[in-house]
């Protein structure tokens, strides 16, 4: 169980480093964000099953709901930006130009 927790922690930190390093494209940022959410889901599920917290069994499901909402909003933003500008650079997301 310890090796699975360490692997998921390593996956989270790798996705976080990817988010910090490859932040020029929106698609790569969304993929790193999904990797972070997936590792958080697996870690929370393992923690709940290992510690047998019966009160918090709904926490991983709520995390999946928020991840699905984040993915839908991110994909809608990606489609809008790529249709408007033709590129998926994050520099195009300047809110002052509205």
UniProtKB/Swiss-Prot annotation:
Gene field: MT-ND4L
A GO term, aspect molecular function: NADH dehydrogenase (ubiquinone) activity
Role according to the record: Core subunit of the mitochondrial membrane respiratory chain NADH dehydrogenase (Complex I) which catalyzes electron transfer from NADH through the respiratory chain, using ubiquinone as an electron acceptor. Part of the enzyme membrane arm which is embedded in the lipid bilayer and involved in proton translocation.
Protein name: NADH-ubiquinone oxidoreductase chain 4L
Entry keywords, A to Z: Electron transport, Membrane, Mitochondrion, Mitochondrion inner membrane, NAD, Respiratory chain, Translocase, Transmembrane, Transmembrane helix, Transport, Ubiquinone
Broad class of the protein's primary localization: mitochondrion
Topological type in the membrane: Multi-pass membrane protein
Record lineage: Eukaryota, Metazoa, Chordata, Craniata, Vertebrata
UniProt-annotated location(s): Mitochondrion inner membrane
Residues annotated as transmembrane: 29-49, 61-81
Subunit structure: Core subunit of respiratory chain NADH dehydrogenase (Complex I) which is composed of 45 different subunits.
Root EC class: translocase
Keyword Lipoprotein: no
EC number of the protein: 7.1.1.2
